[in-house]
Amino acid sequence: MLTRKQYELLRFINERLKEAGVPPSFDEMKDALDLRSKSGIHRLITALEERGFIRRLPNRARAIEVIKLPELSQAAGNRRGFTPSVIEGNLGKVRTSTPALEDGERPVAVPVMGRIAAGTPIEALQTRSHTISVPADMLGNGDHYALEVRGDSMVDAGILDGDMALIQRNETADTGDIVVALIDDEEATLKRFRRRGASIALEPANTAYEVRILPPNRVKIQGKLVGLYRKY
């Protein structure tokens, strides 16, 4: 399990490697994560290396190799149904101009309906509070709403505490989908959905949490996860 800062740094390093072919400097990492000193970056780098997500190459300056990402750390069979699409801050990158938007990039107002637990289930969904703007091509067809994620039980699927989960309204789900599940009409939780015989399994993406096995009459599907909205 990664902390939020560890995950943010790992994503930043991976994106910079893809864009520039070289990892960011420690100063760039410090600025991107809004840390006061480079010692914090050293600790994060060490933690990521100890957990097997990166490797520092000896005798080379700024030589960091990303070995895996949390979203990719599970077997493909355990990830069916969702690959995170994330709207996020630009991590310090500056755009010199603003290009014209294509139709699919034009924002759509998505209502925020409260909070959802990625941990111990919390109270049922609340009423609409405000809206966020999301590119239309990120959502696809159907009706959508957003929920603020609370907890870390889905961190290995790339879903962090504080993210906005973008949900497509749906009352059914396929095995492997990440869903909003309403338990006993009282508790709402964000988990991976699986069928186990005549029962339903709600699986976390964090080994610190247990799978919940419930009869179908206790679980109502409220929607499926289609993306994440993340601000830095």
From Swiss-Prot:
User: Where is the secretion signal located?
Assistant: none
Q: Name one GO molecular function term.
A: serine-type endopeptidase activity
Name the family: Belongs to the peptidase S24 family.
Q: Which reaction does it catalyse?
A: Hydrolysis of Ala-|-Gly bond in repressor LexA
Q: Where is this site: Cleavage?
A: 118-119
Q: How does it assemble?
A: Homodimer.
Keyword Transcription regulation set for record = yes
| Entry keyword Ligase | no
What is this protein's function? Represses a number of genes involved in the response to DNA damage (SOS response), including recA and lexA. In the presence of single-stranded DNA, RecA interacts with LexA causing an autocatalytic cleavage which disrupts the DNA-binding part of LexA, leading to derepression of the SOS regulon and eventually DNA repair.
Q: Name one Pfam family in it.
A: LexA_DNA_bind
Q: Which GO terms describe its biological process?
A: DNA repair; DNA replication; negative regulation of DNA-templated transcription; proteolysis; SOS response
Instruction: Give the EC number(s) listed in the UniProt record.
Output: 3.4.21.88
The entry's active site is: 153, 191
Q: Which UniProt keywords apply?
A: Autocatalytic cleavage, DNA damage, DNA repair, DNA replication, DNA-binding, Hydrolase, Repressor, SOS response, Transcription, Transcription regulation
Protein name (record): LexA repressor
Task: Report the source organism.
Answer: Bradyrhizobium sp. (strain ORS 278)
* Location of the DNA-binding region in this protein: 26-46
